[in-house]
């Protein structure tokens, strides 16, 4: 039993030891946990303080950056404001200068107007003075000489004419020089700009065409038995077929380029086909005619596209195409019309006028030449009638009538079209005249110049585009020759027709000769 007691005591001791160990371990665990909690709490407080510190620094940094950015924005806004103020200031200065220039121009215009008004008053005063003197002289003549009123009047007029002719000539030169210089410079600038901006190629038109043949045997086949082929050809086409000794070539002659072109193509088709007889000639003629009709339509459309004019009636476009086969003084009329339209458009643009209207009038100004050989009347009258029929405006019709002076221009564009027509026609090499008309025109030029008083001789030069007039130096002066040049030019304009511009040059030469012995 004793050993049982020892066992019980042992178990009790073990249990007590275990309980004591557990108690001690729990206490230590609680202490360790408390330490960990305390350490964690301290760490948390440290992290919170660190985060608060970092947040405070970030906040300060953000505030500083925001202030710097706001300052930079304010500086940029201030720079932009100063820049705009400077631009406004410069603009105001430019406007002020422009106002000053306009004011000076107004003053200059006022001065010129005052000068003209004073000059007018002075002239009226002189005229009145002349009239009073004339009356006084007339009265004295009647009293002293016992002549009639009409005789006295004639004597007075003759004396006044001789006395004041020189003064009138000098006054004419002054007025002409003063008021034409600026206009002349401006006009030359505009015309020069227009011409240099439009410089087309040009090929002179002739009245004959040549067709190459494969061999000379073809000439006999074209003539046919007893000349029946050539007679049929000339009857159908209305063109002369000239067959001479020129090897492998025949010549077509006609003043009508349209008929000549149809005839040329007919010959080419006959030569290519090889079968030449009257029936075949008629067949090939119809084919060539149809080809040319298509080409006429295409030429009209190309001209309209080139110039940039729209809304034309199809029949007007067809008439334009026919101008491709029409010449005037050797100049192709369609090429001339396109050139006039382009020059008129450039001039209108320079002067701030209606460019489209000027181009339209320029393109259509010679439209009547398409059928003037088929209808009675001048090409301007025919053209105006055709345009009216196909719905063109009165302004365009006036351009057609005014470009040769049959009507007064009712719009500035009409005057521009007339000027463009003259520029195109006056271009060197653009036009030709036949020899007979050319010689007659030169003779008439010299005859007009020689008809004036104090003219010694006159010579037409530069292919009739200039006439030089030699005057007596001892009976004229520099003032009177200006008036003489103006009078001759005016008479030439009224009495002669000529392409382009004609220059009148009056020459006064004084020579003194002495001999040394």
From Swiss-Prot:
It is found in: Cell membrane. Gene3D superfamilies: Hypothetical protein af1432, K Homology domain, type 1. CDD domains: HDc, KH-I_RNaseY. It holds the Pfam family KH_1. The keyword Membrane applies. Its main location: membrane. This is Ribonuclease Y.
């Amino acid at each position: 039993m004793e050993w049982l007691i020892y066992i019980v005591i042992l178990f009790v001791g073990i249990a007590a030891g275990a309980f004591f160990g557990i108690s001690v371990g729990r206490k230590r665990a609680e202490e360790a946990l408390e330490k960990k909690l305390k350490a964690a709490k301290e760490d948390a407080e440290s992290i919170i303080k660190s985060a608060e510190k970092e947040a405070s620094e970030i906040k300060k940094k953000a505030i500083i950056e925001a202030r710097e950015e706001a300052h930079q924005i304010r500086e940029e806004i201030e720079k932009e404001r100063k820049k705009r103020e400077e631009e406004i200031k410069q603009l105001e200065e430019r406007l002020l200068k422009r106002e000053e220039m306009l004011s000076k121009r107004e003053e200059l215009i006022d001065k010129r107007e005052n000068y003209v008004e004073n000059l007018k008053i002075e002239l009226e005063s002189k005229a009145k003075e002349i009239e009073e003197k004339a009356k006084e002289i007339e009265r004295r003549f009647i009293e002293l000489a016992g002549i009639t009123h009409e005789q006295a009047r004639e004597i007075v007029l003759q004396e006044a004419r001789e006395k004041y002719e020189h003064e009138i000539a000098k006054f004419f030169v002054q007025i002409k020089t003063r008021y034409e210089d600026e206009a002349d410079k401006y006009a030359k600038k505009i015309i020069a700009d227009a011409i240099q901006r439009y410089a087309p190629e040009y090929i002179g038109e002739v009245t004959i065409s040549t067709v190459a043949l494969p061999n000379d045997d073809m000439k006999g086949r074209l003539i046919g038995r007893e000349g029946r082929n050539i007679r049929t050809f000339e009857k159908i086409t209305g063109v002369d077929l000239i067959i001479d000794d020129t090897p492998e070539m025949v010549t077509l002659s006609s003043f009508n380029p349209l008929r000549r072109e149809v005839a040329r193509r007919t010959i080419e088709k006959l030569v290519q086909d090889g079968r030449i007889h009257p029936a075949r000639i008629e067949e090939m003629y119809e084919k060539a005619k149809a080809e040319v009709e298509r080409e006429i339509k295409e030429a009209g459309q190309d001209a309209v596209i080139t110039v940039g004019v729209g809304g034309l009636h199809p029949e007007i476009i067809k008439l334009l195409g026919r101008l491709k086969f029409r010449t005037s003084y050797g100049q192709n009329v369609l090429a001339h019309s396109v050139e006039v339209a382009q020059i008129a458009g450039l001039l209108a643009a320079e002067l701030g006028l209606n460019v489209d209207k000027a181009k339209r009038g320029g393109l259509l100004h010679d439209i009547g030449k398409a059928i003037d050989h088929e209808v009675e009347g001048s090409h301007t009258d025919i053209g105006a009638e055709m345009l009216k029929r196909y719905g063109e405006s009165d302004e365009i019709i006036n351009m057609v009538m005014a470009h040769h002076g049959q009507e007064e221009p009712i719009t500035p564009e009409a005057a521009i079209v007339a000027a463009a027509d003259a520029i195109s026609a006056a271009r060197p090499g653009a036009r030709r005249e036949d020899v007979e008309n050319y010689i007659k025109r030169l003779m008439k030029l010299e005859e007009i110049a020689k008809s004036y008083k104090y003219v010694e001789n006159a010579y037409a030069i530069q292919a009739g585009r200039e006439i030089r007039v030699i005057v007596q130096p001892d009976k004229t002066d520099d003032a009177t020759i200006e008036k003489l040049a103006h009078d001759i030019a005016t008479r030439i304009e009224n009495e002669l027709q000529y392409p382009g511009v004609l220059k009148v040059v009056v020459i006064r030469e004084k020579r003194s000769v002495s001999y040394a012995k």
